Amino acid sequence: VSHKTHRGTACVGALLACVTAFGGALASPAAASPAHRPATPPPVSDFKGVNWADPRDNYADDAVVPSGLSISDGYATTYAKSKAIIGGFSELGANTVRLPVNPTSVNGPFWKSYRGAIDAATAKGFKVILGYWEADNAKDGKIDDQASWDRMWARITSAYAGNPKVYFEPMNEPFGYTAQEWTDIAAKWVNTHRFIARDRILIGGYKYSEDVKPVCADPRLKGTRLALHNYGFWHTDWTSVDQWKADFKSRIGDCASRTILDEFGASMTTGLDYNGPVGTSNEIAYIQAATDTIRELGLGSVYWPGLRNGDTYSLTTLQGTGTNLSLTVNNQSGLDRLHYAWKQ
């Protein structure tokens, strides 16, 4: 059973059908200019973001396609759709978006179009985190195919090494590896891509990216950012905000200055009041604790998801047709808590 089956149903909603990728390959993009490191890299607290996800939870054997986009669209249409959706995220107060990649989406024909989403986001001034998801027919917490994974990252980094707003997360939730195995893989990735400034690399925590301490402690990964995940459904009987805060802090240790909580979320379509008393709701306790902790420790944060069709956790719902798209907020109190976390 998937660790994330709570997130809703696949292929629900109008704008994105389940799709199948088609074969073929594009020439690799020309090598980008050498990476330009900002004089002062932004602190993690400047990452105020949302995930933009495929209705299938980003696990796909074919191309992974964020909600509202289509593999049948060219670059210009993808850019226009993405400009509208990123504009909606900006209106929420976000300045960061996390997007999924997989070998089919990058090594195949969709990449030429998908770059429109990345480019629209960076043109808006957004930081973009590109993270690898394994296929839905694997889901063993391991890289599906080393050669295609390497080729994917070579293509992505050659395209975006020169754009300091693009960040790279080698793998989402590497739960199939021991801590030592995962840090070995991560260290090899960092060394292979040493032309990328380390502050532009997010290394997921151990297991379900749920504990950053082993990664933080590895000297080979010094200077990288750390990606943490935590969800309220992991402890459905916890209704104490303080208990949740302690749980968050136990996963971070003394590594807060490097940590971006790039997945956290709860139900946004069920009418919960995240500003109100906790009562018997583990979700309210969890969201209040998460946002308190983000604010207190100065963590980066990327809500799951800002948009995913058919997901009860989705902060927004996509409206419109064609490239005339907009977002409506599903739960204002949930957004209020994000604004509190983001000091807005």
Q: What are the language-model segments listed below?
A:
Residues 142:
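Short acidic-hydrophobic catalytic motif
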Residues 1-34:
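Secretory targeting and sorting signals
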Residues 20, 27-96, 341:
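N-terminal carbohydrate-binding accessory modules
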Residues 64-79, 146-154, 158-167, 171-300, ...:
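Extracellular glycoside hydrolase catalytic/binding regions
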Residues 106-108, 139, 177, 271:
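Short, function-defining helix-loop hinge/capping sites that tune catalysis or transport
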Residues 81-136, 147-149, 190-196, 279-297:
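Aromatic-lined substrate-binding rim segments of carbohydrate-active enzymes
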